[in-house]
Amino acid sequence: MAEYTRSISFYGREIDINIGLMAPQAGCGVWLTSGETSVLVTATRQAGRAGVDFLPLLVDYEERLYAAGRIPGGYLRREGRPPERATLISRLIDRPLRPLFPEWLRDDVQIVATTLSVDDKVPPDVLCILGASLAIHSARIPFNGPVAAVRVGLVKDEFIINPTYAEIEAGDLDLVVAGCADGVIMVEAGANQLPEKDVVEAIEFGFEAVQELLKAQQQVFADLNITPVELPPPPQNEELVAFVAEHAQEEIRSVLRQFLDKTSREQQLEAIKAKLEAQIQARPEGDPLRLYLLENPKELDNQFKALTKKLMRQQILQEGVRVDGRKLDEVRPVSCRVGLIPRVHGSALFNRGLTQVLSITTLGTPGDAQELDDLHPVDEKRYMHHYNFPGFSVGEVRPSRSPGRREIGHGALAERALVPVLPKEEEFPYVVRVVSEVLSSNGSTSMASVCGSTLSLMDAGVPIKAPVSGVAMGLIKEGDEVRILTDIQGIEDFLGDMDFKVAGTRAGITALQMDMKITGITVDVVEKALLQAKAGRDYILDKMLEVLPAPRPQLAKTAPRLLTFKVDPEDIGKIIGPGGKMVRSITEATGAKVDISDDGTITVSSSVGGQAEAARAMIENLVRRVEEGQVYLGKVTRIIPIGAFVEFLPGKEGMIHISQLAEYRVSRVEDEIAVADEVVVKVRSIDHKGRVNLTRLGISPEEAARVRNHHP
């Protein structure tokens, strides 16, 4: 492809598009630059593999630290496993693209977005979505796009398109909206307890901005004479379709109307499918349908699922009844328990239907904060939420692996939902980690993790501003007929058109994530879903607060105790000491852990009472300004003919002249004191070089008793 360039003016910024300069052997390489943020997005298609019955789409976002002028740490000095943020951006790019590919496409498709440079203003993620849409079309891959995305911020009650990092940090909303010609196709947001109406306005504002990027892409395609590539659906075996409908339709409908639990329903559906398979196998060897299934063994399963999907959707659309008997806006039974696990700092077990999540809270010190080594300006996290999804939670046998993209994404969503209600560091200096263990899954485990996290934090005594609950909303849409479902279970997620996760407090929304399986919905449908979700969230929150109405007034006995105080930043070196000698000695002497910030904030933690106070006293003694007349308890370190040296503060010595050892005349210093003796001394004078002269004279019994009693 010949090199093509174009520049788009978009909300006060230029977006420079270059197609064809880079990655000539990829299907297409698109290089986009906005400000000093630059990304390369490639799209490549490869002939499908035999036996694949799904779209093998792979989306990878690659961060290179050279983009920020940095060299990676570690022995190898190169990037290793993608950081969590890269995984989240990969998912963010994937989610608006996937619904727009023909569902029958079986070719391998890979999108790779590489950040080449970043500035401190333009986040690369939404730029990558634009680049992916351009690359897919330019590579002549079947795709029902174009698609584009924008970020919407809210600063001082004003919506901003594609805000800078600073504006995102200062604002109350961080919303990404993706859309295509048919409507909104993806939403992801974190918000500071925003009312539903404000969020809807933000989505509408963002969707209007998306239209400009869609028009710009159409102009690019017109310039390059690129037309959409059509991929007609593969022909169906009409005999198989008719056979499945004739022999299974009424039985499937009967199962769906029995309002069974997940396990019973799946067992009965599997029995119906097995009977179909047996009927076909009983046919003569030369029977066309039997031969067809020998060549296409997955087609019976595909047609059975398609019929089940059709009947479930008909039941919801025509009768307003779901497969478990619930109304469209009804939440499954909710139950909660807290404080189940001994020794941990906080725990909660949250049940909603057959979905069960155990959330456990751990409180740590500032030194336990997670250091982030990526291209984002934020370099550490004080709150971490980790989500685990073992095979047994869905009755499967599979080996345990490191967290996959789904687990990372669900964990991050639940984390985002709680961040707006966490106390400020000045009020609660602990680093907090919550782990949500999915013990049973039948839909919406991420929102169950939000509810479990809230209760676990409250059980741990974390003074959150308000409790947060979450619910997943679904959608069934056929033509103009639309039904919104509250608290979807697994089958409704799998066979439905939308998974819209909404989390928030009574005051407003804290996190959103909407994924579509169809090519977009209107903002009106989004608004209805949010309002219906509000009722569901409030119902769940009521159930949670029946168990634990407020954070516990005290931390768990096993939680570390923290003391926080400030010192002059110039004194930090004294506290650390050469090679960390002094701070290590404090830890060894007291058993407390010491964390030091660059601004002079000292946090001392201990699990045993008195340790933190002892460490604080030692630190305060280290940085205390020595003044004449102050009285100390010191230790004799060495003796010379004319006197003795006494360490009266850690690392600080002064000399007692022989004439200041006693009220009477002392002939030999050794006759009065010895090395390692503890002595009460007073600062007599400090000379121009900072040398301290001490005395044992003129100290009252009360002063001596005071320093002995308060010495750590």
Curated annotation (Swiss-Prot):
It comes from the Bacteria. InterPro entries: ExoRNase_PH_dom1, ExoRNase_PH_dom2, ExoRNase_PH_dom2_sf, KH_dom, KH_dom_type_1, KH_dom_type_1_sf, NA-bd_OB-fold, PNPase. Its EC number is 2.7.7.8. Keywords: Cytoplasm, Magnesium, Metal-binding, Nucleotidyltransferase, RNA-binding, Transferase. The keyword Iron does not apply. Involved in mRNA degradation. Catalyzes the phosphorolysis of single-stranded polyribonucleotides processively in the 3'- to 5'-direction. This is Polyribonucleotide nucleotidyltransferase. It comes from Synechococcus sp. (strain JA-3-3Ab). The lineage of its organism: Bacteria, Bacillati, Cyanobacteriota, Cyanophyceae, Synechococcales.
